[in-house]
Protein backbone atom coordinates (compact mmCIF):
# COMPACT_ATOMS: atom_id res chain seq x y z
CA UNK A 1 0.00 0.00 0.00
CA UNK A 2 2.90 2.36 0.70
CA UNK A 3 3.87 2.12 -2.99
CA UNK A 4 0.71 3.94 -4.06
CA UNK A 5 1.93 7.23 -2.62
CA UNK A 6 0.01 10.43 -1.98
CA UNK A 7 -1.45 10.80 -5.48
CA UNK A 8 -3.17 7.40 -5.46
CA UNK A 9 -3.88 7.28 -1.72
CA UNK A 10 -7.70 7.44 -2.13
CA UNK A 11 -7.54 3.99 -3.80
CA UNK A 12 -6.13 2.39 -0.65
CA UNK A 13 -9.39 2.31 1.35
CA UNK A 14 -11.41 0.64 -1.45
CA UNK A 15 -8.72 -2.05 -1.76
CA UNK A 16 -8.69 -2.64 1.99
CA UNK A 17 -12.48 -2.96 2.10
CA UNK A 18 -12.43 -5.43 -0.80
CA UNK A 19 -9.66 -7.50 0.79
CA UNK A 20 -11.54 -7.87 4.09
CA UNK A 21 -15.09 -8.24 2.71
CA UNK A 22 -14.86 -9.62 -0.83
CA UNK A 23 -17.03 -6.84 -2.28
CA UNK A 24 -16.96 -6.11 -6.00
CA UNK A 25 -15.39 -2.82 -7.12
CA UNK A 26 -18.73 -1.16 -7.87
CA UNK A 27 -20.14 -2.34 -4.53
CA UNK A 28 -17.20 -0.86 -2.64
CA UNK A 29 -17.69 2.50 -4.39
CA UNK A 30 -21.43 2.38 -3.64
CA UNK A 31 -20.95 1.72 0.08
CA UNK A 32 -22.38 4.46 2.32
CA UNK A 33 -21.63 5.09 5.98
CA UNK A 34 -25.22 4.24 6.92
CA UNK A 35 -24.59 0.76 5.50
CA UNK A 36 -21.86 0.09 8.07
CA UNK A 37 -22.32 -0.86 11.72
CA UNK A 38 -18.89 -0.41 13.28
CA UNK A 39 -20.01 -1.53 16.75
CA UNK A 40 -21.54 -4.81 15.56
CA UNK A 41 -18.91 -5.15 12.79
CA UNK A 42 -21.02 -5.81 9.72
CA UNK A 43 -21.97 -3.97 6.55
CA UNK A 44 -24.94 -4.19 4.22
CA UNK A 45 -24.37 -4.29 0.47
CA UNK A 46 -27.26 -2.41 -1.14
CA UNK A 47 -25.96 -0.71 -4.28
CA UNK A 48 -23.19 -0.50 -6.87
CA UNK A 49 -21.53 2.31 -8.82
CA UNK A 50 -20.66 2.01 -12.51
CA UNK A 51 -19.82 4.19 -15.47
CA UNK A 52 -22.37 3.96 -18.26
CA UNK A 53 -20.35 4.51 -21.41
CA UNK A 54 -23.43 4.81 -23.60
CA UNK A 55 -24.79 7.67 -21.49
CA UNK A 56 -21.40 9.08 -20.43
CA UNK A 57 -22.62 9.15 -16.83
CA UNK A 58 -21.54 7.62 -13.55
CA UNK A 59 -24.55 5.81 -12.11
CA UNK A 60 -25.48 4.25 -8.80
CA UNK A 61 -27.97 1.41 -8.64
CA UNK A 62 -28.65 -2.18 -7.54
CA UNK A 63 -25.90 -4.77 -7.13
CA UNK A 64 -25.14 -7.32 -9.83
CA UNK A 65 -27.78 -9.77 -8.57
CA UNK A 66 -30.12 -6.98 -7.41
CA UNK A 67 -30.12 -8.46 -3.90
CA UNK A 68 -29.18 -6.94 -0.55
CA UNK A 69 -26.70 -8.95 1.50
CA UNK A 70 -24.86 -8.60 4.82
CA UNK A 71 -21.12 -9.16 5.30
CA UNK A 72 -19.38 -9.41 8.68
CA UNK A 73 -15.84 -8.14 9.25
CA UNK A 74 -13.27 -8.10 12.03
CA UNK A 75 -11.24 -5.75 14.19
CA UNK A 76 -8.68 -4.84 11.52
CA UNK A 77 -11.21 -3.39 9.08
CA UNK A 78 -13.08 -1.76 11.96
CA UNK A 79 -9.95 0.20 12.87
CA UNK A 80 -9.35 1.10 9.22
CA UNK A 81 -12.91 2.40 8.79
CA UNK A 82 -12.89 4.37 12.05
CA UNK A 83 -9.64 6.01 11.01
CA UNK A 84 -11.03 6.81 7.54
CA UNK A 85 -14.16 8.38 9.01
CA UNK A 86 -12.10 10.53 11.35
CA UNK A 87 -9.81 11.60 8.49
CA UNK A 88 -12.78 12.55 6.29
CA UNK A 89 -14.12 14.74 9.08
CA UNK A 90 -10.74 16.44 9.37
CA UNK A 91 -10.57 17.02 5.61
CA UNK A 92 -14.07 18.47 5.59
CA UNK A 93 -13.11 21.00 8.26
CA UNK A 94 -9.88 21.80 6.43
CA UNK A 95 -11.56 22.37 3.05
CA UNK A 96 -14.51 24.30 4.40
CA UNK A 97 -16.93 25.33 1.64
CA UNK A 98 -14.68 23.80 -1.00
CA UNK A 99 -15.37 20.32 0.37
CA UNK A 100 -17.60 18.29 -1.93
CA UNK A 101 -20.75 16.42 -1.00
CA UNK A 102 -22.13 13.58 -3.11
CA UNK A 103 -25.60 13.32 -4.59
CA UNK A 104 -27.69 11.16 -6.86
CA UNK A 105 -30.72 12.06 -8.94
CA UNK A 106 -33.36 9.97 -10.68
CA UNK A 107 -33.58 10.30 -14.45
CA UNK A 108 -36.03 8.53 -16.77
CA UNK A 109 -35.02 7.92 -20.38
CA UNK A 110 -36.87 5.71 -22.86
CA UNK A 111 -39.03 4.24 -20.09
CA UNK A 112 -35.96 3.29 -18.09
CA UNK A 113 -34.90 4.77 -14.73
CA UNK A 114 -31.29 5.74 -14.00
CA UNK A 115 -29.69 7.17 -10.87
CA UNK A 116 -26.88 9.52 -11.80
CA UNK A 117 -24.10 10.32 -9.34
CA UNK A 118 -22.75 13.85 -8.85
CA UNK A 119 -20.57 15.82 -6.44
CA UNK A 120 -20.78 19.54 -5.66
CA UNK A 121 -18.83 21.77 -3.29
CA UNK A 122 -20.38 23.95 -0.61
CA UNK A 123 -20.56 27.02 -2.83
CA UNK A 124 -22.85 25.38 -5.38
CA UNK A 125 -26.62 25.63 -5.44
CA UNK A 126 -28.08 22.16 -4.94
CA UNK A 127 -30.86 21.25 -7.42
CA UNK A 128 -34.13 20.16 -5.84
CA UNK A 129 -33.98 16.70 -7.41
CA UNK A 130 -30.56 15.92 -5.88
CA UNK A 131 -30.47 13.53 -2.89
CA UNK A 132 -27.36 13.52 -0.71
CA UNK A 133 -25.57 10.23 -0.06
CA UNK A 134 -22.74 9.79 2.44
CA UNK A 135 -20.37 7.50 0.53
CA UNK A 136 -17.43 5.83 2.26
CA UNK A 137 -14.74 5.94 -0.42
CA UNK A 138 -13.85 9.55 -1.09
CA UNK A 139 -11.10 11.71 -2.49
CA UNK A 140 -9.47 14.28 -0.17
CA UNK A 141 -11.89 16.98 -1.37
CA UNK A 142 -14.91 14.81 -0.52
CA UNK A 143 -15.84 13.80 -4.08
CA UNK A 144 -16.74 10.15 -4.57
CA UNK A 145 -14.04 7.72 -5.69
CA UNK A 146 -15.06 6.12 -8.99
CA UNK A 147 -14.45 2.55 -10.20
CA UNK A 148 -12.65 3.87 -13.29
CA UNK A 149 -10.12 5.82 -11.21
CA UNK A 150 -9.43 2.82 -8.99
CA UNK A 151 -9.04 0.69 -12.12
CA UNK A 152 -6.31 3.03 -13.35
CA UNK A 153 -4.45 2.67 -10.04
CA UNK A 154 -4.73 -1.13 -10.28
CA UNK A 155 -3.21 -1.05 -13.77
CA UNK A 156 -0.39 1.14 -12.45
CA UNK A 157 0.36 -1.44 -9.77
CA UNK A 158 0.21 -4.23 -12.36
CA UNK A 159 2.59 -2.50 -14.77
CA UNK A 160 5.09 -1.02 -12.35
CA UNK A 161 5.30 -3.13 -9.21
CA UNK A 162 7.44 -6.30 -9.46
CA UNK A 163 5.55 -9.44 -8.51
CA UNK A 164 2.13 -7.91 -9.24
CA UNK A 165 2.03 -8.54 -12.99
CA UNK A 166 -1.30 -10.39 -12.67
CA UNK A 167 -2.89 -7.98 -10.19
CA UNK A 168 -6.39 -6.61 -10.71
CA UNK A 169 -9.03 -5.37 -8.26
CA UNK A 170 -11.09 -8.55 -8.56
CA UNK A 171 -8.05 -10.50 -7.30
CA UNK A 172 -8.83 -9.08 -3.85
CA UNK A 173 -12.24 -10.76 -4.02
CA UNK A 174 -10.59 -14.00 -5.11
CA UNK A 175 -8.15 -13.77 -2.19
CA UNK A 176 -11.03 -13.23 0.24
CA UNK A 177 -12.79 -16.30 -1.15
CA UNK A 178 -9.68 -18.43 -1.02
CA UNK A 179 -8.82 -17.40 2.55
CA UNK A 180 -12.30 -18.24 3.83
CA UNK A 181 -12.53 -21.65 2.17
CA UNK A 182 -8.94 -22.59 3.02
CA UNK A 183 -9.68 -21.88 6.68
CA UNK A 184 -12.78 -24.03 6.91
CA UNK A 185 -15.68 -21.76 5.96
CA UNK A 186 -18.67 -23.56 4.47
CA UNK A 187 -18.97 -23.03 0.68
CA UNK A 188 -22.68 -22.13 0.98
CA UNK A 189 -21.89 -19.41 3.53
CA UNK A 190 -19.12 -18.01 1.33
CA UNK A 191 -21.48 -18.00 -1.67
CA UNK A 192 -23.95 -15.85 0.26
CA UNK A 193 -21.23 -13.47 1.47
CA UNK A 194 -20.01 -12.95 -2.09
CA UNK A 195 -23.45 -12.69 -3.65
CA UNK A 196 -22.75 -15.45 -6.17
CA UNK A 197 -25.80 -16.80 -8.00
CA UNK A 198 -24.42 -20.35 -8.03
CA UNK A 199 -22.12 -22.16 -5.62
CA UNK A 200 -20.10 -23.53 -8.55
CA UNK A 201 -18.90 -19.96 -9.22
CA UNK A 202 -17.59 -19.75 -5.66
CA UNK A 203 -15.74 -23.05 -5.95
CA UNK A 204 -14.31 -22.17 -9.36
CA UNK A 205 -12.89 -18.94 -7.93
CA UNK A 206 -11.28 -20.92 -5.11
CA UNK A 207 -9.85 -23.51 -7.50
CA UNK A 208 -8.41 -20.76 -9.73
CA UNK A 209 -6.87 -18.94 -6.76
CA UNK A 210 -5.42 -22.20 -5.46
CA UNK A 211 -3.84 -22.96 -8.85
CA UNK A 212 -2.36 -19.47 -9.02
CA UNK A 213 -0.88 -19.85 -5.54
CA UNK A 214 0.73 -23.18 -6.45
CA UNK A 215 2.03 -21.77 -9.73
CA UNK A 216 3.59 -18.80 -7.96
CA UNK A 217 5.14 -21.10 -5.36
CA UNK A 218 6.71 -23.19 -8.13
CA UNK A 219 8.19 -20.07 -9.74
CA UNK A 220 9.56 -18.97 -6.39
CA UNK A 221 11.23 -22.35 -5.88
CA UNK A 222 12.81 -22.04 -9.34
CA UNK A 223 14.38 -18.76 -8.29
CA UNK A 224 15.57 -20.05 -4.92
CA UNK A 225 16.89 -23.50 -5.87
CA UNK A 226 17.29 -23.14 -9.64
CA UNK A 227 20.17 -24.88 -11.40
CA UNK A 228 21.86 -21.65 -12.63
Model regions and ranges:
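C-terminal catalytic core of tyrosine-transesterase DNA break-rejoin enzymes
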Residues: 16, 20-27, 149-156, 160, ...
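Hydrophobic, well-ordered secondary-structure elements that form the walls
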Residues: 45, 73, 137, 154, ...
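C-terminal secondary-structure termini that scaffold catalytic or DNA-interacting sites
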Residues: 40, 51-53, 58-77, 82-83, ...
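Catalytic-site neighborhood detector that most strongly recognizes the C-terminal catalytic loop/helix
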Residues: 49, 175, 194-220
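Basic, Lys/Arg- and aromatic-enriched nucleic-acid-binding interface segment
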Residues: 1-31, 38-39, 67-68, 91, ...
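Active-site/catalytic core of tyrosine-dependent DNA strand-transfer enzymes
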Residues: 74-164
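Short, contiguous acidic/charged loop-to-helix segments that flank catalytic cores in large enzymes
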Residues: 3-8, 59-68, 138-147, 160-171, ...
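Short, polar N-cap/turn motifs at the start of nucleic acid-interacting alpha helices
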Residues: 35-42, 185-205
Amino acid sequence: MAYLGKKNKPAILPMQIAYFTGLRLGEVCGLAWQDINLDEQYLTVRRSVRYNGARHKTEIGPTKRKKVRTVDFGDTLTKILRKAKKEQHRQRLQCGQLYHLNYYREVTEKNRVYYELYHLDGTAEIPEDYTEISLVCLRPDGAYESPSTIGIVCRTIKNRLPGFENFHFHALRHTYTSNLLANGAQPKDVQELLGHSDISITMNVYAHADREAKRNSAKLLDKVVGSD
